């Protein structure tokens, strides 16, 4: 039986503390936990087909999404389309501003309001998952065609049950859940496409618009979007939930954050305004460092000719023959004591220029960002990095400014 990703990630983290930044974890497989080396390898090595490729019957609609594409030409073409959607300019996009106003302000904040004088115990994970789905489907299709999971808890519960069956149900139950998810996403795609008129003008940073505009078939569009929805539902909600959890525990961090946020106004607030707040940015970086949801190792293959790992990395030159599987565990990278002293401690101050040198590690705060490998790197790194940071930043601001 294969070792679960979370267990393997922890085993690698433990091994690194004893053996160094290059650890052999199989007959022809090594794990590297030096960030600069990982970036080099992930930028130049190919995906390992046996890990990424799925049988056609397991693919949504029988079509591969960007993540599962192993052929460079095919992957590059799809990535170009999505890179334009998820570029930094989304921060000033009118479409994204409309999505933020509708999903975050009109739906999320109202959902989170608690009557004055009442104390309420609430499971925030489902709320954050519902928010992420509403936000991402609105981003993909515009708010008019998004899910309404924040307001329709019964439909969201049904959606979550499909995902549970897909991942952990019997073969028959998983097959049925896959069919229901495909129909659900395809219905949204068709509804959005039916709304397009002959004079329709492309909407900047609207995912469905970009995919249809590039000439993709409806099944290809639906497969790509469904992969986005399922991935974001799991990963972003973890960051959001742990943000609330850690701030509830570390009340002094919460108070300092709110004090900084009070310097801004909700009116005409831009993402750049938030990015200029040092402690706000530090909190987000520390949450992503300490709570890495992505445990899978995303392996790569050493190409023909092999590769020499420099002596400066592991103390001796190490040759990796062609065909060697190379992986990196984000958790191990984020718990590197040389870069992040007391790595198990939640300490946002480490990211500030004014940090105590004894606790800041070898890297300066700006350099530390290079060691934050939450989104991976290279041509196969997370294409939606800017979207994820935007969503996390906006949600964190509204939750804290509203003192929820």
From Swiss-Prot:
Protein keywords: Heme, Iron, Metal-binding, Monooxygenase, Oxidoreductase
Please list the GO terms describing molecular function: heme binding; iron ion binding; monooxygenase activity; oxidoreductase activity, acting on paired donors, with incorporation or reduction of molecular oxygen
- What PANTHER family is this protein classified in? CYTOCHROME P450, CYTOCHROME P450 12A4, MITOCHONDRIAL-RELATED
Matches recorded under PROSITE patterns:
CYTOCHROME_P450 (PS00086)
Q: Which domain of life is it from?
A: Eukaryota
This protein's cofactor list reads: heme
Q: Family, per the entry?
A: Belongs to the cytochrome P450 family.
Q: What does this protein do?
A: Cytochrome P450 monooxygenase; part of the cluster that mediates the biosynthesis of a highly modified cyclo-arginine-tryptophan dipeptide (cRW). The first step of the pathway is perfornmed by the arginine-containing cyclodipeptide synthase (RCPDS) avaA that acts as the scaffold-generating enzyme and is responsible for formation of the cyclo-Arg-Trp (cRW) diketopiperazine. AvaB then acts as a multifunctional flavoenzyme that is responsible for generating the cyclo-Arg-formylkynurenine DKP, which can be deformylated by avaC.
Specify the pathway. Answer: Secondary metabolite biosynthesis
Q: Which species expresses this protein natively? A: Aspergillus versicolor
UniProt: heme binding residues? 382
**Protein name (database record):** Cytochrome P450 monooxygenase avaI
Read off the SUPFAM superfamilies from this record: Cytochrome P450
Q: Which Pfam families match?
A: p450
Q: Name one GO biological process term.
A: secondary metabolite biosynthetic process
